[in-house]
């Protein structure tokens, strides 16, 4: 049997499918998620149910978002899960997670995410951060390092700044390729994202922040002065007490927010 087949399903490369099979890792992740009936529990990419089954076992209802029609069909006819699942067949990148919120209940979102969409999916989920209590994701280890990076490090970038603007970021555990079928060519890790109830550095317009950060990191090796010359002057940098000769990875999240807020003030 091909090493890409698990429980009779062949992993599809175009969907980035790698199925988690290590029971010890599964137990650790479920413990970190802490499933309960006080939140709307949402799984992205349930696959063959490695996390779905133990989580659903602890709660009354689990909402899942799955793109693969074959896997959706398996879930719909699953002897144990079918009565506990609310299944949405579709692309999580296009999905309106806001529709899942219930009165008085925030969401707990989790999943073993396809690595080929993990970064854009993070940005999509940040748009619903105010409706989410916690997020737990299995990701490529490199992405976890980017999410949790500190200023001045190679991993620090656009994803870091936006993730840490919206959330407290906590690495949970590292997972070797042998924990999956088929084994991915990269190491994996689990991350916990805790959206802030009150943001420590409030931004007047997050679209402005997003544009500023994207522009700053378009050319990582160049200085802020060069990358942001169409947005901020030397006088602006001086007023903010930010050294314009620094590179984008040397600037902290609150400094990016301060620059974005200055841009908002200029537009008013």
Curated annotation (Swiss-Prot):
PROSITE patterns given in the database record: RRNA_A_DIMETH, SAM_RNA_A_N6_MT
InterPro entries cross-referenced by the UniProt entry: KsgA/Erm, rRNA_Ade_diMease-like_C, rRNA_Ade_Mease_Trfase_CS, rRNA_Ade_methylase_Trfase_N, rRNA_adenine_dimethylase, SAM-dependent_MTases_sf
Keywords assigned by UniProt, alphabetized: Cytoplasm, Methyltransferase, RNA-binding, rRNA processing, S-adenosyl-L-methionine, Transferase
Cellular compartments annotated: Cytoplasm
Main EC class the enzyme belongs to: transferase
HAMAP family named in the record: 16SrRNA_methyltr_A (MF_00607)
Annotated PANTHER family: DIMETHYLADENOSINE TRANSFERASE, DIMETHYLADENOSINE TRANSFERASE-RELATED
This protein's name: Ribosomal RNA small subunit methyltransferase A
